[in-house]
Amino acid sequence: MKKKLLSVAAVASVFTLAACGSNDEAVINYKGGEVNKADVQDEAYQKAGAQIAFQQTMNKLLEKEYGKKVTDKEVEAEVKKTKDQFPDKEQFNTTLQTAGIKNEKEFEKVLRTQMLLKEAKSAKSKVTDKEIEDRFNQEKVEVKASHILVEKESEAKAIKKQLDEGGDFAKIAKAKSTDTGSATKGGDLGYFTKGKMVEEFENYAFKDGVEGKISDPIKTQFGYHIIKVTDRKEKKDFTLEKESDRIKKALAEEKSAQVNPNDIYRSLMKKYDVKVENKDFKDAFDLDKQEQQQMQQQMQQQQQ
């Protein structure tokens, strides 16, 4: 819970502007509103003002675009859900302060912003009937398989030869498989549906007519697998009508998790014609440049 509140704190910061001039002076303009100096106040303004201006702008635009979709009651319910995870109010307040959040009122604001961003992601995560049907078809068939995983192809070929000559699959798996999770069970992976294993593994495991057969070595990112499919079946009482809502929700959550918040911010800035009036803030609003710099940093770290 502390980690959750600490992550929330990143959105919560409200800084005091040390620069001179009126607090009503706009630093960002957009259709139907503005962000002024009072929105980004703090003594740390000189260092963090640009980033705070960006965050305040995005908060206001999220509110403008999605505010009607998040009610006060929903926010209050989320706050209560969080508070209920603490033994008492004192510990809750202490954790808030540790996370840099002054009080419960401020926490409500932070939580509301997160809920607005979630709404924005959901708007970009529509699920089609075909996607639901495809996932249903994936899930209704499950197979049971065992495998032996080794690092080198030469070792996999030698093991396959042993098996072709009558070697015991379970005994060899226990002795030689590097997948410690299944090796102790003779390589048994149990039943699984499509989407649970890597693609190369599934391409063999879900092929028709492979039950009881032993595959040639199959290469994946983990090494070389020798697979034995021992059963294949369709789930009982598993209908599209019963599973549709669950699948739709799961797909929407998966899609939402893949949405880049910067894509949301770009579309909002374009829609509301955001103009950065303060030249010191321009880089904070240049998301393409920031993403480019992050990629360069990641490449440099990988090379080290």
UniProtKB/Swiss-Prot annotation:
Localization per Swiss-Prot or TrEMBL: Cell membrane
Keyword Lyase listed: no
InterPro entries named among the record's database cross-references: Foldase_PrsA (IPR023059), PPIase_dom_sf (IPR046357), PPIase_PpiC (IPR000297), PrsA_foldase (IPR050245), Trigger_fact/SurA_dom_sf (IPR027304)
Signal peptide: 1-19
Region (Disordered): 285-304
Domain PpiC as annotated: residue spans: 140-231
Keywords: Cell membrane, Isomerase, Lipoprotein, Membrane, Palmitate, Rotamase, Signal
Membrane topology: Lipid-anchor
Record flagged with keyword Glycoprotein: no
Protein origin, superkingdom: Bacteria
Any one Gene Ontology BP term: protein folding
GO molecular function annotation: peptidyl-prolyl cis-trans isomerase activity
Alphabetical list of Pfam families matching this protein: Rotamase_3 (PF13616)
Gene3D superfamilies named in the record: 3.10.50.40
Lipidation (S-diacylglycerol cysteine): C20
Catalytic activity from the UniProt record: [protein]-peptidylproline (omega=180) = [protein]-peptidylproline (omega=0)
SUPFAM superfamilies in UniProt: FKBP-like, Triger factor/SurA peptide-binding domain-like
Annotated Low complexity bias: 292-304
Protein EC: 5.2.1.8
Lipidation (N-palmitoyl cysteine): C20
GO cellular component term, pick one: plasma membrane
Family: Belongs to the PrsA family.
Function: Plays a major role in protein secretion by helping the post-translocational extracellular folding of several secreted proteins.
Name used for this protein in its record: Foldase protein PrsA
Species lineage: Bacteria, Bacillati, Bacillota, Bacilli, Bacillales
